[in-house]
UniProtKB/Swiss-Prot annotation:
UniProt protein name: 3-ketodihydrosphingosine reductase TSC10
Motif segment (GXSXG): 14-18
Membrane spanning residue stretches: 255-275, 280-300
Endoplasmic reticulum in keyword set: yes
Natural source organism: Saccharomyces cerevisiae (strain ATCC 204508 / S288c)
Lipid bilayer topology: Multi-pass membrane protein
First-tier enzyme category under EC: oxidoreductase
Length: 320
């Protein structure tokens, strides 16, 4: 199933910011016959996003903006309109059912779905609140689980491209990401199972590295120094660049997608009983085997030493 921007009905969760918002812009600007539905919890942010995308497009094309537009997904549907929003708590299964009932009633069941909703609260485990722990599973796993299940029920015979966003931390979890990485690892397992069960679907999984977004800026406020030390001097790439890399990889046929070379290397070292569907898979396996023998043992010893040393020197900060 070829990835294309044109002639689609695309559902984008987490569409009011970050990569979800960037993909909504990409579909709106580069396709002419695609309907785009963005979903998140905040109706105000969704409306702002729709207006921003529409106005930016008119400025780019030097055309006149059509003024106030009813972007909210509801009947009667303007057949000329291409961008819609639907406020929904995707962590609540009943709310997702209502979303798909609305899509079904309006004959807008998606042909492509991008599950972009998510976010991290990087802190040491003792410093997290119960609310933050629950939020990690709600927005990083349940949002995708609920949407994927409804799509599977709605599209039992038709082809569908389901694009799920995990994280490089699913392949290499480390200190500071206890609220986030386990949920993203669960996404990785879910993808492996859905690829076996949903034979009429193309299922892609994206493992982004750091990219500039509102969420990334907020994460830096709570991220422990030891987390930054292990991450290394990895600069966040622009969100648009990450979006373009992902779209290009999907169009090329890759179904395990990375935004940087580090992610590709880490997946090579993640040897397991799941099929790899990334670029240069044979080379990735060879690299992974050699790295696991020659590099990983020494790296992990050094990493463990740095973590223990940091905690000894920052004994009073263990809950921060």
């Amino acid at each position: 199933m070829k990835f294309t921007l044109e002639d689609q009905v695309v559902l984008i969760t987490g569409g009011s910011q970050g990569l979800g918002k960037e993909f909504a812009k990409k579909y709106y600007n580069e396709a002419e016959n695609t309907k785009i539905i963005i979903v998140s919890r905040s109706e105000a942010r969704l409306l702002d996003t729709c207006n921003e995308i529409r106005i930016e497009a008119h400025l780019r094309r030097e055309t006149t903006d059509e003024g106030q537009v009813q972007h909210k997904l509801a009947a009667p549907l303007d057949l000329e309109q291409r961008l819609f929003y639907y406020p929904c708590d995707l962590s609540c299964y009943e709310s997702v059912e209502c979303l798909f009932n609305a899509l079904r009633d309006l004959d807008l069941l998606p042909t492509q779905t991008l599950c972009c909703a998510g976010g991290a609260v990087p802190k040491l485990f003792r410093g997290l609140s119960g609310h933050e722990l629950n939020l990690g599973m709600d927005i990083n796993y349940k949002t995708t689980l609920n949407v994927a299940h409804q799509i599977a029920l709605a599209e039992q015979t038709k082809e569908h491209h389901l694009i799920i966003f995990s994280s490089a931390t699913a392949l290499y979890p480390f200190v500071g990401y206890s609220q986030y990485a386990p949920a993203k690892a669960a996404i990785k397992s879910l993808v492996a199972i859905l690829r076996q069960e949903l034979t009429n679907f193309r299922i892609s999984c994206v493992y982004p590295g750091n990219f500039e977004s509102e969420g990334f800026t907020v994460e830096q406020l709570t991220k422990p120094e030891i987390t930054k030390l292990i991450e290394g001097p990895s600069d966040a790439i622009p969100c648009k660049q990450a979006c373009d890399i992902i779209a290009k990889s999907l169009a090329r046929g890759d179904d395990d997608v990375f935004t940087d070379f580090v992610g590709w290397m880490i997946m090579g070292m993640d040897l397991g009983l799941t099929a790899k569907k990334s670029r240069f898979v044979p080379l990735q396996w060879i690299f992974g085997v050699l790295s696991n023998i020659l590099v990983v043992p020494f790296y992990m010893v050094g990493c463990s030493w740095y973590i223990r040393k940091w905690f000894r020197e920052n004994d009073g900060k263990k809950a921060n």
